[in-house]
Amino acid sequence: MKELKHLMYFERLLDDAHNELVRQAEAEGDLAIGYTCFHAPEVLLNLGSCFSVRLRAPHTTSMELATYYMANNSCEFSRAILERALEGGYGFLHAMAGVDVCEANNRAIENMEIMHAQGADKDKFFYCNLDIPYSDDEDCVEHICEQVSRKILKPMRENYGVDTSDAAIRAAVSEHNEVCRILTEIGETRKLDNPPITGYEYAVLVLVSYVCPKRLILPLLRETLAEVKTREVDAQKNYRVRVAVVGSEIDDPDLIRLIESCGALVVADRYCYGSFPGRQEIVLTDGEDALTQVCRWYLQHTECPRQSALHRVQYRNDHVAQLVHDFKADGAIYEQMKFCTYWSYERVIANQVMPRDYGIHILSIDRPYIAGQSGQLRTRVQAFVESLEMKQLRAAQKEDN
């Protein structure tokens, strides 16, 4: 297929957290608020002149300093983020929205605050650490509303004069929903037998929507949607099998590129920094305040294995099965960041439950933060592709008989 018009520009935006569009927005007077986790409600970080930047540490080579302050058996994602912060890579931020979800990420942001990683002369800068409930009932919704109001909206309003009213929240939701509609429409094309977009390209599109100001990335996403609608696909399919990828943080699209180079087209992205969850519309009604509805939406749509209530576990398993069915995947790859506590449990359980209860063939892996060039991972994915092909062959032979 012909390369997407803006793909190379999008890739350049992913080379640095302080990318060109972030710099442009700040030059125009906007305020960047950093976050890492789905549980820090993204849409509430985009009120008024504020815009969210989901933190990444592209091109990480060493984590020695972060390992000194944390531990060599702590999550590599968290260590990479702390390392980049200590290098001064996030000095452009005006606030940092943390969450008390996983210990490693919590410790990373705590160290940022202790060592003043935000830089000097930032009296208005604030850190927050939201206490996230383990379930999604109305008591939990009330709790997270109080946390967000006190720890995010109040300092935004008092430190920077940001409008945090109900009308401002609804305006932010409207802009957020347009991003979601565009990415959903593009993503739906992956259900086709010969999609007009690859998993790698889609991962790049989703990532830039997380790390760039919405108002500046939206025109480029609109153009890309129009381009995908009319894109001519290759006559021959360029994949051998279709897979869903499920798991923890994938903020490096080169991992998706590696999987696809083995012949497995990634048709569903159910991982942190992917489109499931995070790129679905938030539907608001007029009968309740917007803040409560937004907080409820994030609690009810999280797919983090920290949510240990039984109905949440069932929800996650059912959703993966639904994605595999809807996107016509031949199997699923469950991946976890090395040393991730919650996903280590989820991945092991899924290794038993998904084949047994749902008939879904899976590959279960743990991986380093930078995995795009991993020879061992490539070998395992290649073997998985071959096993899926053998499964298809046996099924075809059974039908013939």
Protein language model features and the residues they cover:
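Glycine-rich, highly charged phosphate/nucleotide-binding loops
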Residues: 69-87, 308-320
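A charged, amphipathic alpha-helical module
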Residues: 1-31, 146, 150, 154-281
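Short, charged, surface-exposed secondary-structure boundary motifs
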Residues: 61-70, 138-140, 275-283, 373-376
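Metallocofactor- and cofactor-centric catalytic cores in central/energy metabolism, strongly enriched
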Residues: 12-22, 26, 34-43, 62-66, ...
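TerminUS-proximal long segments
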Residues: 317-324, 329-331, 335-341, 346-401
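Acidic/His-rich segments in extracytoplasmic proteins that coordinate ligands and/or metal ions
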Residues: 80-155
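Redox- and metal-dependent alpha/beta enzyme cores, enriched for Fe-S-associated oxidoreductases
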Residues: 27, 38-39, 44-56, 247-312, ...
